[in-house]
Design a protein with these regions (language model features):
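Gly/Pro/Ser/Thr-rich low-complexity, intrinsically disordered segments predominantly at protein N-termini
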Residues: 1-177
């Protein structure tokens, strides 16, 4: 089902159903827990401060991957655009870094969403795994997977490929302890 089929008169600015749209299906996600929210808040703050005017940050907003796929990642670090995203939705080419914070949603984020991100050429995805206290860094999309993978944990640092000068410590604040 194309996304326009549930939009009044096909208007992209109309109210949309709650939840991600994955391959035409509306997927209701579990409510966000305290650790999940705290991690998103910490990452949002750090990325906004570090990126400054070089990028925009879109927390928990839809990203249009395909005609029938529009997930709502926890964070999308996106390129500035002249239209300020009023005329067209955020798409894969706009995304500099996409972040999914996962506790109960890890398997879904890793095995359903990540291949979709790779297939649509989202250049970099981080999965913040709150269960194992690590951040998975996925880069270089190829077909439905990423060819570069790294895992960082407490005491390490992580940097977006688009902004290697942004160095974030993987600490208790990011991992929400």
């Amino acid at each position: 089902m194309p996304l326009t089929s549930w939009m009044p008169r096909g208007r992209p600015d109309a109210a949309r159903p709650q939840g991600s749209v994955i391959e035409g299906e509306i997927v209701k996600m579990s409510p966000i827990g305290l650790r999940h929210a705290a991690s998103v808040i910490a990452l949002t703050r750090r990325l906004i401060l570090a990126a400054g005017d070089r990028a925009r940050l879109s927390p928990q907003n839809p990203v249009r991957l395909l005609g029938d796929t529009e997930p709502e990642p926890d964070i999308a670090l996106i390129r500035p655009r002249a239209d300020r995203y009023v005329r067209a939705p955020i798409g894969p080419r706009d995304v500099l870094l996409l972040v999914e914070v996962a506790d109960t949603s890890y398997r879904y984020d890793r095995y359903v969403k990540l291949p979709l991100y790779a297939r649509t050429r989202v250049r970099e995805v981080w999965i913040v795994d709150l269960v194992h206290d690590v951040i998975e860094v996925h880069r270089r999309p190829s077909r439905d997977r990423y060819t570069s993978f790294a895992q960082v944990g407490p005491g390490d640092t992580v940097s977006p490929a688009a902004f290697p000068d942004i160095v974030l410590p993987v600490d208790d604040e990011l991992l929400a302890h």
